[in-house]
């Protein structure tokens, strides 16, 4: 990787989407309602070759706040809230069964949060069974994954997940430095994480991911490299290394972070450059803009074939799935729509009590949206673009259709961050760090409203 010129590189740091969707969530509107979703379900059920399903269930509860967290979370220690939530999940599942063909193949299954393991093992088992009763056709090679908070993870949890077929776990690690953990209100010693990982390995979990974050308060380059040394001792299969997005105007808990302790933009770039170098020397290859995988991992092998896909859960080797969002605030996705459930638990419950799917908002994609989504997701996933694949799928002349956008990429070429070739273009190793910036050139919705987003660097 070329050495970063920090003065020149800093010019690229500006607010921009992470492109877990296109159009992005700020474009979701309330005129996409329950009837819109039912129509989308009908259309997808009646495709000549219906896509496999990906089930995402949001389990929103946490006992206490982690100050860095941007997830949709409800803080509670009340058992009755969890019991009540399970009853409403069952109501939603019953409505989904009537609204779509739930006998279609399920290729992916994911629990996110919140803290999924804040639910007791019997409760997790009850939730999983309820979902499997409605969506019974699990594929033989299904990916079943769960987010794990090591502070709330027991052998009984692991046994339940194992019995239900879970084969992937993602551990929230963030940073092993105690001073960083204190500043973000999340204390979890290395030994605690080590014990949780050993438990997962003992049960034969085939894929273990760690979530790490750089840009947190009290972080330094030296300190984060020490965290990475500890990470290597635990030998995860994959790493997601996120750039901390400090958006206190969006997430109130972030206001508890002392901003004077946050690394400067230059310091963050130094951390990023050093972590990429460190991990690549340790045989972890960079995937997209924020993931790493061992060179024999399926993610890296898919990247080599330009077959990676990106969705709200991150990067995947599954080519095309229809995501069904279950639970408060969860997001669903089809080939030409996005939908989101109510973010407020009260309104989520009220809709279900009235017998309605709890749709708060969404967006139906135009043909141009679908085209641009494909371009942006290819860029975000594979850090390159083959024009012919887009031309064949959408019957367009790529260079003519995106003449203005390609002109906007030329400064990146001149800076040595991107190269054009006979097939299309490809980002350099350093240019891949700016994939969000380059993808923004193809975003038809950006019109000075970038204040909604975190900075790209």
From Swiss-Prot:
Q: Where does S-adenosyl-L-methionine 1 bind?
A: 56, 113, 147, 331
- Give, as one word, the top-level EC class: oxidoreductase
Report the family membership: Belongs to the anaerobic coproporphyrinogen-III oxidase family.
Where in or outside the cell?
Answer: Cytoplasm
Annotated [4Fe-4S] cluster binding sites: 62, 66, 69
What would be the name of the gene that encodes this protein?
hemN
Q: Where is the signal peptide?
A: none
Q: In which pathway does it act?
A: Porphyrin-containing compound metabolism; protoporphyrin-IX biosynthesis; protoporphyrinogen-IX from coproporphyrinogen-III (AdoMet route): step 1/1
Cofactor(s) named in the record: [4Fe-4S] cluster
The catalysed reaction is: coproporphyrinogen III + 2 S-adenosyl-L-methionine = protoporphyrinogen IX + 2 5'-deoxyadenosine + 2 L-methionine + 2 CO2
SUPFAM superfamilies registered for this protein in UniProt: Radical SAM enzymes
Q: What does this protein do?
A: Involved in the heme biosynthesis. Catalyzes the anaerobic oxidative decarboxylation of propionate groups of rings A and B of coproporphyrinogen III to yield the vinyl groups in protoporphyrinogen IX.
Task: Report the Gene3D superfamilies cross-referenced here.
Answer: 1.10.10.920, tm_1862 like domain
Biological process GO annotation list?
porphyrin-containing compound biosynthetic process; protoporphyrinogen IX biosynthetic process
The name on file for this protein is Oxygen-independent coproporphyrinogen III oxidase
Grouped into one coarse class, the protein's main location is cytoplasm
- Kindly state the subunit structure of this protein: Monomer.
Species whose genome carries this gene: Helicobacter pylori (strain J99 / ATCC 700824)
Which terms are listed as keywords in the entry? 4Fe-4S, Cytoplasm, Iron, Iron-sulfur, Metal-binding, Oxidoreductase, Porphyrin biosynthesis, S-adenosyl-L-methionine
How is the co-factor bound, per the entry? Binds 1 [4Fe-4S] cluster. The cluster is coordinated with 3 cysteines and an exchangeable S-adenosyl-L-methionine.
Per UniProt, what is one GO molecular function of this protein? Answer: coproporphyrinogen dehydrogenase activity
Q: Which residues form the Radical SAM core domain?
A: 47-279
Which InterPro entries does the record match to this protein?
Answer: Coprogen_oxidase_HemN, Coproporphyrinogen-III_oxidase, Elp3/MiaA/NifB-like_rSAM, HemN_C, rSAM, rSAM_horseshoe
Q: Which GO terms describe its cellular component?
A: cytoplasm
Q: Which domain of life is it from?
A: Bacteria
Q: What is its EC number?
A: 1.3.98.3
């Amino acid at each position: 990787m070329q050495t970063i010129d920090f003065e020149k590189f800093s010019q690229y740091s500006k607010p921009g989407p992470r492109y877990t969707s296109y159009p992005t969530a700020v474009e979701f509107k309330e005129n996409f309602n329950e009837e819109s979703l039912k129509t989308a379900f009908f259309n997808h059920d009646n495709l000549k070759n219906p896509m496999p399903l990906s089930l995402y269930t949001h389990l929103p509860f946490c006992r206490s706040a982690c100050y860095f967290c941007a997830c949709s979370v409800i803080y509670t220690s009340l058992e009755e809230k969890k019991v009540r939530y399970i009853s409403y999940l069952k109501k939603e599942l019953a409505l989904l069964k009537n609204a779509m063909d739930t006998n279609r193949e399920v290729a992916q299954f994911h629990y996110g949060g919140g803290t999924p393991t804040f639910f007791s093992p019997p409760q997790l088992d009850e939730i999983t069974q309820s979902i499997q009763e409605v969506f019974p056709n699990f594929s033989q090679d299904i990916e079943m994954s769960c987010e794990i908070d090591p502070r709330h993870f027991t052998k009984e949890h692991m046994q339940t997940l194992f019995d239900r077929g879970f084969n992937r776990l993602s551990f929230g690690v963030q940073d092993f430095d105690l001073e960083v953990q204190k500043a973000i209100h999340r204390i979890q010693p290395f030994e605690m994480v080590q014990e949780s990982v050993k438990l997962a390995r003992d049960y034969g979990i085939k894929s273990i991911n760690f979530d790490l974050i750089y840009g947190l308060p009290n972080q330094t380059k030296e300190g984060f490299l020490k965290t990475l040394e500890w990470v290597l001792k635990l030998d995860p299969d994959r790493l997601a290394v996120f750039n901390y997005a400090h958006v206190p105007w969006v997430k109130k808990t972030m206001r508890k972070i002392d901003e004077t302790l946050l690394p400067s933009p230059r310091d963050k770039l130094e951390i990023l450059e050093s972590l990429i170098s460190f991990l690549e020397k340790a045989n972890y290859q960079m995937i997209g803009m924020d993931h790493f995988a061992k060179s024999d991992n399926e993610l890296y092998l898919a990247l080599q074939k330009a077959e990676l896909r990106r969705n709200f859960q991150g990067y995947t080797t599954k080519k095309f799935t229809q995501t069904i969002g279950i639970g408060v605030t969860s997001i669903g996705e089809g080939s030409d729509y996005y939908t989101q459930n109510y973010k407020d638990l009260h309104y989520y419950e009220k809709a279900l009590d009235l017998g309605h799917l709890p749709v708060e908002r969404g967006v139906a994609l135009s043909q141009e949206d679908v085209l641009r989504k494909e371009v942006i997701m290819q860029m975000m996933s594979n850090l390159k673009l083959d024009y012919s694949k887009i031309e064949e799928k959408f019957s367009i002349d790529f260079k003519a259709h995106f003449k203005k956008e390609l002109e906007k990429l030329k400064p990146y070429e001149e800076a040595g961050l991107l190269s054009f070739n006979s097939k299309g273009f490809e980002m350099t190793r350093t240019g891949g760090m700016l994939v969000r910036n380059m993808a923004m050139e193809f975003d038809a919705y950006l019109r000075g409203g970038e204040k909604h987003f975190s900075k790209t660097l």
